[in-house]
Amino acid sequence: MTPSLLAHLRRVDTPTVCNAIEVAQGKRGFAAFTRGTMQCSAPRDPAIVGFARTAKIAALSPPSEPPETIKARRMDYYRYMAQAPLPAVAVIEDIDYPDCIGAYWGEINTTIHKGFGLSGAVTNGVMRDLGDMPDGFPVVAKSIGPSHGFVHVRDIGSTVSICGLSVSDGDLIHADQHGALVIPTDVIGSLENAIEKLLSTERIVLDAAQKKNFDFETFKSVWDQFEKART
């Protein structure tokens, strides 16, 4: 990923990237995105962009493994996150879903992960401490709650499922208040141009609709241009 593409991705929202991927692929039907409504800790922040660092957690019940095993895995998890190639995004599956109760993402964990250089986090689980999270580290979560429960790390680095989206370690993630998606590797090289094409195509309708004397006849004309230009 080039610095120019990274800057482009941070400037646009996730729906724009969804559409731009289809422009790059030349067809409709891109489906590697989350389903349902997600919550964002900082909806006005730029989009979360980076390569996935994955893990699984649980919190409903106390861990059944020995405490030393849990502690060792916790340190392995933090080491794994600290060594992430940047830009990176923590993508964490709560295996208690849809009955998640343990907020893994609060003031402490967001501050730690931001300190490691990560750009944000995506989870099907719970977040909390919304007024105390550090600036510049958005979290996109399925829900908000007060407790951490018995939260503990179950697995590190394996493929995870986030609200219908399968994410593997190293996948390129784009996420914001609308949800998250995985950018296919085969469009990374053409995605920057696809974003520009999409935005210019949308302006055909938007610019006309914002002018005075916009009427149905004008709409028909610009919509025909729009249809010919879009994917």
Predicted regions and their residues:
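Intrinsically disordered, low-complexity regions enriched in acidic/Ser/Thr/Pro/Gln residues
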Residues: 1-71, 75-84, 206-214, 220
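Long, charged alpha-helical interface segments
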Residues: 4-13, 193-195, 223-231
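Buried hydrophobic positions in well-ordered alpha/beta secondary-structure cores of metabolic enzymes
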Residues: 21, 113, 171-173
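General beta-strand structural signal in soluble alpha/beta enzymes
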Residues: 31-33, 91-93, 121-125, 139-141, ...
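Extracellular/luminal Protease-associated
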Residues: 79-126
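Histidine/lysine/aspartate-rich catalytic loop segments that bind and position anionic ligands
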Residues: 128-144
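Acidic, glycine-rich flexible loop/linker segments
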Residues: 144-217
